[in-house]
Structure formats: structure tokens, C-alpha cells
Amino acid sequence: MLNGLTRVSTSSELESILDIVQSSGEIAVVFTSPSIGDLETIASETQRRQLRIAGIPRGGYTILPAIPLYDDELLQMCERYTAANEYEKAEMRNSLYMREYPLFAYSMRHQRALFHPADYVSRILQFCSYYVQAPDADVLSLQDRSPFLHISPIKEICTQLRLIARGTPVAASDSESPVPEQLRLHAESDVEKLAAERATAMSIAASSGGASETEQLSLFSGVAPSALFQKDAVEEVNKDAEDTMEDLTGEETVDAVHSFQAEYLTLDGFELVTKASIFYDREGEGQCIVAVYIPGGVPEDTCRAAAAVLEPAATKKNLRAPTNGGLPPDTGIVGYYDYLTNPTQHKCRETEFSRRNWGLLAQSEPLLKHLDKLYSQLAPMHHHLQRVAIPSQYQLCGTVFSTITVNRNFRTAVHTDRGDFRSGLGVLSVINGEFEGCHLAIKRLKKAFQLKVGDVLLFDTSLEHGNTEVVNPEIHWQRTSVVCYLRTGLMSSVCEMERRKHLNRLILEQLLNTEVRNTTVNINGADSSLPPLFVPTRLASHLAPVQLAALGFIVERTEKQSGCVVAMTMGLGKTLVALTLCFSQLYLAPQADILILTPKPIISHWVDEKNKWGMHGLHFPHFVASDGLNSLEFEQQLLEYERQKNNEKPKSGHIFVINGEYLAGFLRRFKRFTPLVMIVDEGHRVAAKGNKLTESLDRLRCNLRIVLSGTPLQNDASELYRLVGWVNKGVSRVLPPKRFQELANDINQFVEGDDGAFYNAVVAQEYIQDWMRGFVFREMENDLPPLHDYLLICGSSDVQREYEEKLGLTETAMTALKATEHRPHHLSTHPACYLAFISDSYQSMVSGWTVRALSNTSRQRVSQLEEIDTMRLEQYVQLVENEQLDAFIDLSGKMRVLVDIVLRVQARKEKLIVFSLYVGSQDLIHRTLTALRVCTFTVRGRDSQDRRRRAMQEFSENKDLIVLVLSTKIAAYGLDFTAANHVVLFDSWWNPQVDAQAIARAYRRNQRKPVTVYRLISATENKFVLRSQTRKIALFKCILHERTSRQALPDELEDCAANEKDEERRNFWAKLKMTSLAGDTRALLNVYRYQESVRESE
């Protein structure tokens, strides 16, 4: 007995009947009897086999096969089928045989199917089509004759589509005999009983560690609101949240002061501007507005009405003393602010003054509207970009302003405004007072602007500015001014996620005590100011908070006809974000086309993700991918699209996933191709100068350009500038390339070790971050398990040192050599690898560990070797053939360290990936580990997508497969190897993002264990790679992580082997340091934490 339920024994006769239904696809009618069993027995066994049961005919039950489609799939098919003509219906029926049915395969895993699931689906579609168009009299009689009308979801789908088609629900006619009451109750009670039993079974399974909550949910029984989103994707609110929210008045930081002592300006040296004027930055390329002066721009009565409600916001509780000679001035913040550095629950919200005075603030709306109109007329490009960037939730009175700084009797010292949107302008106006002087002076322009009540100044708040002296200050003077602007912190990923959680809570409150039965849900539906964002209901709970936030960020930009960059750390699920966006766009515009451009190796990853999430409702009628696995099917899909473009068939939306090499040919074939959205995966490729790919994409008329990249900045800051400029062409018109390069140079100077450039680097860093925030969604952090990342400096054997000296691998020589022909890399792998590479006999050596007869060309290369070298090469082969593996391994520090790491991982029954850039190194590693009887698999750049897919599956499922050896630059993209929690970078590339991509194969979503990364660095060539990497990482942190960083100096790196907190790992480092190579050199010289190679400055 379990919760009042008992296991009912099943008769052999009932089992035979159910076997026939399950294997043949035919229906069967049964009646309760001693040989069959009672209703409970029939219902229990039918449910166990996932078959369906209907309460007809009278006194009996009809058993039907399991429906081989998800509810939303079936609904979509029925919708299309009932609306199609006879020719289109025939095509749809034929297409049913070309698709896969994962639900059917699962339900038949213990049975041999004697029918095709397409036959059953075709019957359902035909019935639904007839039902939708049938006369009422026929519909009523169908209740007695069709079991389809007694099982979900077919009965709900038929009823819904008939209601849509005819506009009236099905009702009993007086002229027709009603459905017998006893039969109606009989059928309904069966459905209710089965539903209740199913829910009870789910509860039991859950309590006993059965299927997960999301697996148990189905639209058959509806989705409970509590299960619609992940728990951490919904805002937590205390009952007394309104009263307990922290008062952070005065905690706002809006100034950047440039000196320790306040600098006050006088009118001396400045030209006083009293007439309407526009000023441009002529130092840049083209004309970029930096200031617009409008005397009398706002009526005085409008100003004074606003002053009456805004002036009380200005108090002495603030952090602006440095711009007021050391004493707090009267100032305050109205509207919204981003309290990102405060330890508060709500980071992005209205200020305390605003929260308590929203009703009164309506009196300032005419002022804000007036300033907004002037802004749009006189600086239209800045205004447009600010309109695109501002989240609708933070718009004050529908303007492009999120925040107002109110100053009362405040003569500011020289400063710049911190946190303002740099693609926009600040709008300053004096709204009350009686005074003389106190002009606003901008040092760079050498202009001072006379500001009286009603005067307006639009200006670049990143320029140093301050007020001149007050005339006759001994006489009582009053002056109230406001600066209206957009706070960029409100567009941060923190604020986006916070806002998303708030919206999710509102949605759940609206759905309280109901079930979500629709196949899709508009997750923006709780806020009418937001564009719709439709997500499959079953998918919503699989979207992490950061993914939901990214989606919200994207659709707000696309609604305003702007693109954006989605910069998320590798492994956070950018592909799912993009596919969900495609679903929403096609839901709203079913005939639109979408282009996804991605590197060829990643196309199969997109297909796999589409198939994976299709099981959760993410379906696309036409998903055309050129993955090379089925070129015939790809061509057929293109021909189908061609017929639609030529109006030979009705148009339906397509998603094209193609690689850059095929793009030109695709566009030649479809000259009128105009996608609604263009998504570029690994989008940093469009940032390269003179890129032909970018030229091809620019020929497409598409404003909605979405760039996906975990590494939007690869080598220098100018890449990011070109990237943002590509998704929104207007950006370069407000920040000329020359000005951006000046900022980037300031950062580079500090990154490369000039501590004297720190201040300029901070200023440049903040400017670039504020400039890009409206167009770049950044989430560089994650909630994954811990990552332990180490630099292991490996020693060299005596043979390696000998060849290093022969090659002249000193530091100065290495700089000139630049790894010519990769010889230093082969030498650091193993002397055998180096000698074989030189002699061109390597392929034979690694294949059979024997030396073959050399060709004439090879003999010429062998002439580079001395006789001792040839003897050594043969000796190394003999070591392996004689199974003297330790002697062979001890000839290389990196190989010795790698082997010991592998054996440690194997002993822990864990898995490891080894990444290497070079084929020779990959092969030698594979052969060495195989000789040690470590089960190893290798995936090279030349391997097919199918082999890579099989490797992923084998690595995940085969417990004996311990090590994967992968090509860094090819296999590092589009693969998920979270079965491994150890990663070895056997060699490193000049671009650190290549290594980061490799690590992300294991350190990504779905990883449940801490991940350890071992970066093997030789004492020769890899030092220079490391220096290049750390410079670029420091730059990356400055720009995207908002951390002012620089390369660590050699004497700043501290060996962490002795103070390693993990005892087992500490002992392992000690063992490696005691291990000797050939020639009595230590295998491991130093251990450093990789993150310490870049130093962050406070």
C-alpha cells in the first residue's frame, strides 16, 4: 500500500489487447469483465504504457495509441492543416513521413512498431479538419462516434479551432438528440479520474526521486504558475517591502573629480556665449556636436512650476563635497538610479525622494517634455541613440531621460559627470532663482554659457566643466538648475536581470490560481510599455535569469529598429537565447525570414540545439541549415524557398543557418532576400578591417543586427568599436573613430605597464563603458561551480636544453624567431616530436613507432640533422617499442607533467580534455597515453562533424573513456564536453580568447563539478605567448569587466604551490616539483594562479 494505492494485477487478456494497440496502432474497445479486469485495472495499465483511453462506447472503453507529438506541435499542425487547400494538405501528409518522432520512439522502446507514427498523425489531422468545418448536427453526433473527442489535447484543439473558424462555440441543438447524460458523465468521469491518477503518480515519482518537475509538466494538465520560471528567475518580495526598502538618499555618485583639490573657474580665459549656438568637436573626424545653447528655450512659468516640486529634492545629504570645496552642497537625484555598488536587494530603482513624491512629480512633466523636444530637434542623432538605449521602465514621462540632478545654490568645481550615456547629451536648464554670473564653462571649448531661468544647454558631460564665479555673492542669491540625462547603469546586466525577475513576478501574480494552458506565453505581457516577447510555455522554466534578461534587452532594441551585441561568457547559452528570439519574431511575423551566420564547425551545434529544445516547444516550420551532412535535403529546402519567393506557393517564414563562405553564393541565388533579423554567431569576425564578410552583410537591407560573442574583444579595443558601429551605424557619428582610438590608447598604455597612465586609463575606461552600454548586453560572470586555473611552468630535459641552445632560443632570439615553422612548440612537446618534424618522418613514427625510408625531399631535410640526431630519433622509437615509457616521457617536462595529471584524473575516476594547436603534438599525446593504456580519443580539425558528434556522445556515455585530445582552434567551438572537469592547455595561442573558448567546452552550463585548468608553459617559447595573452586579458577586463587592469610584473607573481588550500592538490604540486626529468631537471618549476597574471587596480 502506497498513499492508498495498490498495484493492480493485470490479466493476460488485457495485456494482449494493449500489446496489439501499442504495436499495430489500431484502436481497441474493451469492457470490464473478470477476464479483462475492472476500470481501475484498465486505466492503470493503459496509463503505464502511455496509451490513451476514452469513455465510449456506452459501458465500455476505447484504447488508443499514444499521440506521437507534443501538444503544441499537434496544435500547430492542426492549425496549418485546417487552413490549407487539398494540394497543401497532401504535401503536409507526405512531409509527416520525413520527420522524426522522439516521443514515439520512447513509447515504443520495448515494442516493435508495425506502423508508422505519421499514419496516426494523419488520421488526427484529417479528423480535426473535418470537425472544424462540420455542421453542428454532425458535430453533436461525433460525440458518440469518435474517441478523439474524449481525449486531450485533441478535443481541446478541435474545439478551439472550430471556435476560431466559426466564431461560435459548439452548442446542443433543440432539433437534435442531446448526448445521453449518462454517457456524458461516464466519459467526463473517466478523464477526470485518469488526470487525478496521473497527478498522484507524478507526486509519488517526485517524492521517490523520479522524474524532475519540468519533465512531469505537460500541457495535458496545464503548467502551474510556480513552475513557469526557474525559482531564481522570479523576484523575491517581502510583505512589507515598500516600508523596508533602504533609503539610499545621498549614496548616488554622479561626479568624477580630476584633482585632489577643487578647481574653480572664473570667466577669465573664457568667451561668454549669450546667443543661440551649436558647437562641434572639430578635432574628430567629421562634425560631432558637443554643445547646443538655447537661451529662453523653456517658458519661465513651466520652469517655476517644476521648481516647486523638484527643489525639495536638493539636500545636503550627498557625496558631492569634492565639487563644492569640501562641504556638501544642496543637491539631489530625482527619477531612477543604479545603486550597483550598494549591498541592497534592489539595485536599480527610483530614488527615495521620487518614490515618496511620484504624485507631485507630474507637475514637472511639461518641463521634461519641453526639454526632450528641444533635444530631438537640435541633436537628433544623439536623441535617437538615447531613445534606442533607454529601457522603457526607466523613462521619465515618456522622454529619453531616466534621471534628473537638481542643484540649488551650487557653484560646481571642475568635474565630469560620471555614469551618463556617452552616445547622448546631458540637458541642463536653470528653472528658478535670482543671481548674476555662475555661468557654465566648458574648458575644452573655452566657452562659458550664460544661463538664466529658462535657458537650456545640451552638452557632452564627459568634458570637464564647472561654474564661474557668482557676481556679488555677498548679496543673497538663489539658483536652481536641473540636468536631465540617462544613467547607463540602468542598462547593465544586473538591472536587466532585476527587471526581468520583477516582470516574471508580475506575470505569476496575474496567473495566480490558474494553469497556463497556452502553448506560448508573452513574458513581457505584464508591462504594456514593453514589446511582446513570446516564449514556448514549456521552455520558460529552462531559461536562466541571464538568458531572460538578454532576451529582454534584445527585443527592446529590435522594437526600436536597432541591433545590439550580446556579450555573454562562453557556456551561458547564447544559442538558446538566439533561437528563442527567432521563435518570438516568427510568432509575430510568420512569413518573415531570419538569417543566422555562423562558422561552419558550429552549424551542427545550432541544429543540435534546435532539436534539443524542440522537445520543449521551440519549433520552426522551416529551419534550413547548411551543415554539409545532408546536402540533398538542403538543396530541396532551398528549392522550396525559391518556389515561395516566386509566388508559386504560399510564403512561410524560414530560418537560414549558413556559414560565411556560402553567404555570397546564397545572396547571388536569392537577390531579393531581405531578412527581418540577422544574427551573427562568433560575431567578432565582423570587426576585422576590410572584411569581405562584412561587405556582403552590409548589402542586405536589415537594421536588426544581432551579434553573439563570448569574446567581442579579441586583440584591441578598436574591434569593439567596429562591432558596435556595425549593429548601429549612428554610433560612429557621435563618437568619431579618432576620438575612440585616443581613449583606447590611454587604456593600452596602462595595460602594458605604464602606471603613470592610470588616471587617463580610468577616465577612458569609464567613457567607453558608458558609451557602449546602450548597445552591448554584457554578462561576463556566471553562477557555475568554481574554476581553478593554473599556470604550470614546466622544466626542460637536458636534450631539450641542448636543442634550445642550438636554436638560440634566448628571449631576444625568440622575439625575432616568432616560432618559425612551429619548431619551438614541437621541441617543447618532446625532442622526438621536434626531430621527426625536421626529418619529415613524424607521420610514420606516430603511426607505427617505426622510421620509414625517406623520400628525396625528406632526405634533404634530414641533412639538417646531425648523425647523433638521427640516432636519437631511432632511440626514442625503440624506447616506446620496448615499453620503456617513463624514460621516453622524462625527455619532456610538459609531457611528464601531462602524464602525471592524466594518471591523477584517472585515479579520481574523472575525465579530462587536452587541447593542442599542433597536429604533431596531438598525435604524440594520443600515442603516449594509449601506450600507457589510458583510454583516449582524438578529434582533429579535419574530422567531420559526424565524428565530432560521436566523440561527444561517446565521451559522455563511456565511463572508460578518460581523455579527449582536441584541436584548440577547431574543436574549441560548438562542442559541449561537460563530462570532463579537467582541462589541459598543452600549448597556448597569442589570442587568449581562443584558449577561453577551449576551456568553455567543459566550463559551461550543465557543468556540476568544479573545473581545474592546467596551462602548461615551457621555459622558452610560451613565455612570449603568455605576455601577449596577459596584455589582451587586461584590456578585455578593462573594457568588458569594468576593472582597470594591467599585466602583472614578473616579480609580482607568487608561486602558489606551497600555500595551495586544497591539500590533495598541494601534495600533487609538491610531487611534480620533486619529479626529475632526463638530466636531473625538475619537471615542474613553478605554479601560478592564472588570474594573478593580470593585476586589477583599485
Curated annotation (Swiss-Prot):
2-oxoglutarate binds at R479. GO terms for biological process: base J metabolic process; double-strand break repair via homologous recombination; reciprocal meiotic recombination. Its main location: nucleus. Residues 1-540 are annotated as: Thymine dioxygenase. Residues 555-730 form the Helicase ATP-binding domain. It catalyses: ATP + H2O = ADP + phosphate + H(+); thymine + 2-oxoglutarate + O2 = 5-hydroxymethyluracil + succinate + CO2. A motif (DEAH box) lies at residues 681-684. Its cofactor is Fe(2+). Its EC number is 3.6.4.12, 1.14.11.6. It comes from the Eukaryota. This is Bifunctional helicase and thymine dioxygenase JBP2. It comes from Leishmania major. The gene is JBP2.
